[in-house]
A protein has these predicted regions:
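C-terminal coupling/interaction segments
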Residues: 2-21, 306-351
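Asp/Glu-rich intrinsically disordered low-complexity tracts
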Residues: 31-39
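ABC transporter nucleotide-binding domains
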Residues: 40-46, 51-250, 256
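Solvent-exposed beta-strand sheet faces enriched in polar/charged residues
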Residues: 47, 104, 274, 294-296, ...
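ABC transporter nucleotide-binding domain
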Residues: 215-305
Length: 351
């Protein structure tokens, strides 16, 4: 569903428990203003936000979420964790059972008519007229926006198509578009006018690797222009590459939120050993109390030892035990490590 005015989907609008402290890492792939985001007014704030469906299913439970302005904010969670339900409440598509949500400082869904023209959204895939071509679909979206100047409509549509790389396919019927092309067209609809907030639910779904890189570059470009981007994705690598901040959901509850750098740093990382003797190495490390041992060829990894364990002593124990050590060290924690530690779930976190 793409929301930009009242479009083909009929939706109105254009469209933690322990916050981590500190600044985002200095990374050219991230918004250079991320370090100042902690002081920015939040563009999204929820307090006790709860959604219980008929039949008693509790989809979102007492969510306290804060999205600072000027950030690229990643929203992560396993299947059924409540991510999409949260987004639908933020956009006014469904009402909460309890609690409050503010978007751009205004209550939702009550102030949707004021808020949604400043928000572009791509939720659960774009709503398109299959019998119209790509350009005609965007013209429909633009006509549905009462604030859009009809005199510049064509120029806006062409600029949006160019920005998402669909100019060459703009006269092709939407029903013939691939999934990735439909995602691009939905994103173009969300970008027909400048937005203060862009909400994207799995924006790279269906894209090939080059298309994914292009969308990531576009997200960074939008952030550099001052747009706050709220991004739900099942690709942890994508979140690490493009997001400055993130929140993790599990079973309808917020587990943690903070900068991506701090969330990754909060993971203990992994001890890595490269050796032609992985069996002996695993036995010796286990004897010294290490857990989470995993071997892949000549590479052995384990949970990082506690701070009071001397790595030099572990290395010496391996050598004295006849293990031929080619590499030994602790690799820094990743967002994936932090996610698994926080949720107990594996890498596939779509939903």
């Amino acid at each position: 569903m793409t929301t930009t005015g009242t479009g083909p989907g009929g939706a109105a609008g254009s469209a933690g428990e322990r916050p981590a402290a500190g600044k985002a890492a200095s990374d050219p792939a991230r918004n250079p203003d991320a370090a100042d985001a902690e002081d920015a007014a939040p563009v999204i704030r929820t307090r006790g936000l709860t959604k219980r469906y008929r039949g008693g299913q509790l989809a979102v439970d007492s969510l306290d979420l804060t999205v600072p302005g000027g950030t690229v904010f990643g929203f992560l969670g396993p299947n059924g964790s409540g991510k999409t339900t949260t987004i639908r409440m933020l956009m006014g598509l469904i009402s909460p059972t309890f609690g409050t949500a503010e978007v751009l400082g205004r209550p939702m869904p009550g102030d949707g008519r004021t808020v949604l023209p400043e928000v572009g959204a791509l939720i659960e895939g774009p709503a398109l007229y299959g019998f119209l071509d790509g350009r005609e679909n965007l013209l429909c979206y633009d006509r549905a926006d009462p604030t859009a100047d009809p005199r510049t409509r064509g120029a806006r549509v062409d600029a949006a198509l160019e920005r998402v790389g669909l100019s060459a396919a703009s006269r092709k019927k939407a029903k013939a578009y691939s999934l990735g092309m439909k995602q691009r067209l939905g994103l173009a609809a969300a970008l027909l006018r400048p937005r203060r907030l862009l909400v994207l639910d799995e924006p790279t779904n269906g894209l090939d690797p080059q298309g994914m890189r292009e969308i990531r570059a576009l997200v960074r470009e939008l952030a550099a222009e001052g747009t706050t981007v709220f991004l739900s994705s099942h690709l942890l690598d994508e979140i690490e590459q493009v997001c400055t901040h993130a929140a993790v959901m599990a079973r309808g509850r917020l587990v943690v939120q903070g900068t991506v750098a701090d969330l990754a740093a909060g993971s203990r990382g992994r001890l890595a050993v490269t050796t032609p003797d992985p069996g002996d190495a695993a036995r010796i490390l286990a004897e010294h109390g290490l857990t989470g041992l995993s071997a892949d060829g000549d590479r052995l990894t384990a949970d990082a030892p506690p701070a009071d364990v001397d790595l030099a002593d572990l290395n010496a124990a391996l050598v004295s035990g006849g293990v031929r050590v080619r590499f030994f060290g602790v690799e820094r924690g990743s967002l994936e490590d932090a996610f698994v530690a926080l949720t107990g779930e594996g890498f596939d976190v779509a939903g």
